[in-house]
C-alpha cells in the first residue's frame, strides 16, 4: 500500500546506503518496499536518510520482524535507528511510509483488556512513562487509534521494542497485542509518543 502525501506536502522520500556513514551504493524509495534486496540495488542497508515523511523499517522482508521508526533526519549506522531498543538489528530489509502522521491531531485510546475491554485511557500527547501518568498495568491489551500515528515502546523513556500504530492500518483497531507487530510477544507498553512527520 502506497501513501499519498497530504495536499500541499512533499512526497515521502527515503535514501538507503549499503555502508555506514552514507557510503557505498544507494537506493531511493518513494513508496513501500517489501524487500530492498530484490530491487537489485543493495544487498544490505547500513545507513539511512529520511528526506520527507516518516517511515517504518523492518529487519526482515515483507514487513516482518522488529519495527524501527525513522523520522526525518540522518541515521549513519545501526545504533542510530536501534537506539535504546530492546533488540539491536544491524539489518533493515523492508520499508514503508507511515500513514496519517498528523502530529497536531493525534488521539489514541488504551484498553487494559483485549477487544477493547477493561479500564481505558485516552491520550492526545506524548507520555514517556505510562505508569507515572496513572496507567496501573504494565500491559496494554488493545488500543484504538482515532487519529494520527503513534509509536509505543516496551519500557518507560521510549526504550525497548517499538510498535508503530496508525489510524490507517487495521482501521486503527488493534484488538490484541499481537496486532501491534509480528515481534509482539507481550502487551507490555510503558511509553508512547506521536510520530514526528
Swiss-Prot record:
Residues 100-105 are annotated as: Connecting peptide. SMART domains: XTALbg. InterPro entries: Beta/Gamma-Crystallin, Beta/gamma_crystallin, G_crystallin-like. Pfam families: Crystall. Gene3D superfamilies: Crystallins. Keywords: Eye lens protein, Repeat. PROSITE patterns: CRYSTALLIN_BETA_GAMMA (PS50915). The keyword Repeat applies. GO terms for biological process: lens development in camera-type eye. Residues 12-52, 53-99, 106-147, 148-196 form the Beta/gamma crystallin 'Greek key' domain. One of its GO terms (molecular function) is structural constituent of eye lens. The keyword Protease does not apply. Residues 1-11 are annotated as: N-terminal arm. Homo/heterodimer, or complexes of higher-order. The structure of beta-crystallin oligomers seems to be stabilized through interactions between the N-terminal arms. Crystallins are the dominant structural components of the vertebrate eye lens. Has a two-domain beta-structure, folded into four very similar Greek key motifs. Belongs to the beta/gamma-crystallin family. This is Beta-crystallin A2. It comes from Mus musculus (Mouse). The lineage of its organism: Eukaryota, Metazoa, Chordata, Craniata, Vertebrata.
Amino acid at each position: 500500500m502506497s501513501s499519498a502525501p497530504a495536499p500541499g506536502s512533499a512526497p515521502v522520500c527515503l535514501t538507503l546506503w549499503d555502508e555506514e556513514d552514507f557510503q557505498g551504493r544507494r537506493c531511493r524509495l518513494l513508496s513501500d518496499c517489501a524487500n530492498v534486496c530484490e530491487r537489485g540495488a543493495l544487498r544490505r542497508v547500513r545507513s539511512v536518510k529520511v528526506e520527507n515523511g516518516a517511515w517504518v523499517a523492518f529487519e526482515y522482508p515483507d514487513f516482518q520482524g522488529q519495527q524501527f521508526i525513522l523520522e526525518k533526519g540522518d541515521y549513519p549506522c545501526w545504533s542510530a535507528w536501534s537506539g535504546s531498543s530492546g533488540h539491536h538489528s544491524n539489518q533493515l530489509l523492508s520499508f514503508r511510509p507511515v500513514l496519517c502522521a498528523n502530529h497536531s491531531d493525534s488521539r489514541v485510546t488504551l484498553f487494559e483488556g483485549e477487544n477493547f475491554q477493561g479500564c481505558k485511557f485516552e491520550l492526545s500527547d506524548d507520555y514517556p512513562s505510562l505508569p507515572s501518568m496513572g496507567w496501573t498495568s504494565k500491559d496494554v491489551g488493545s488500543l484504538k487509534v482515532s487519529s494520527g500515528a503513534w509509536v509505543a515502546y516496551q519500557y518507560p523513556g521510549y526504550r525497548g521494542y517499538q510498535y508503530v500504530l496508525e489510524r490507517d492500518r487495521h482501521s486503527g483497531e488493534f484488538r490484541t497485542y499481537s496486532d501491534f507487530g509480528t515481534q509482539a510477544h507481550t502487551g507490555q507498553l510503558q511509553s508512547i509518543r506521536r510520530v514526528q512527520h
